[in-house]
């Protein structure tokens, strides 16, 4: 399948990264990006976006994939305001925000979304997003984009545990460890599995370490049911603040979120990111423009910025693997220090789009009946 080719390519990148690190890093000679925009066309887009004056985003926490720097750089570079909606929203919430604001051009209507891989096709099928091909389109792998430009991959990471070792010095090394009584009242997901892509995929990943497979996510639901019955699962949406205070000592999240959290903590509290020893699970996110975007030119400019070399490297600074990584490596534009920051996630598996869709449906429809934990945002 096409998606499986993407997965092979992405895993190949990881191997290539380790080889580069061992050999002293990539070359530093810069080459122009593929499909660089024509100066006049880009100037027209910038002018049109500045006339709109604003971009409305949703579900972009500043500590997620370095979005804080991404947003501030965009604002400074182009002089636009950025209206940030619900930074802790899940992918399902993002689509619902578009549905609810079809006829609203006010501040609650998002221009752009960043959602889990399977949510891109859902959004297209429902007519919630519009096509736009960025100028670096050709350097995005074919398997990671809708051929008509409705959505395209932006970055990927691997699910991990971020552990406040000041509160819990005994770090879990694998999913099964989370059932140990020592973690009573200490483990939380980073979203609601009924709506959040990250939480859904965390449940999906648990199936791999508990007798399931990419074609069978049921053991993941069963595992979380046991975790809930044991009292170890806390029904709160974990974030870095809750990890820092010790209210949630063990957060299940993408590796890039955990690594950026540790940078933020600056040693207080001490913390570690653990890539599970089995069931390593990787996930791709995708970008798209709302079909009802109040600021369509600002949305297009945002996409151009994200998929420029500058934007891709900002994501990488936040420990994410940008989707144009292969092109960036080939042209030698990635600084050695960025390559050295990325963790070893060898052995991670990428589900196909069909597998993701099946797991998504199973988990969202059966979480309440099987697990019974009403996961909510922290008061």
Where on the chain are the PLM-derived regions?
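Conserved active-site beta-strand-loop modules that form the wall/rim of enzyme catalytic pockets
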Residues: 239-252, 258, 269-273
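Periplasmic-binding protein-like
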Residues: 156-160, 221-226, 232, 266-291
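Conserved C-terminal helix/tail region of periplasmic/extracytoplasmic solute-binding proteins
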Residues: 241, 347-379
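Short, low-complexity disordered leader/linker segments with a strong preference
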Residues: 1-52, 375-379
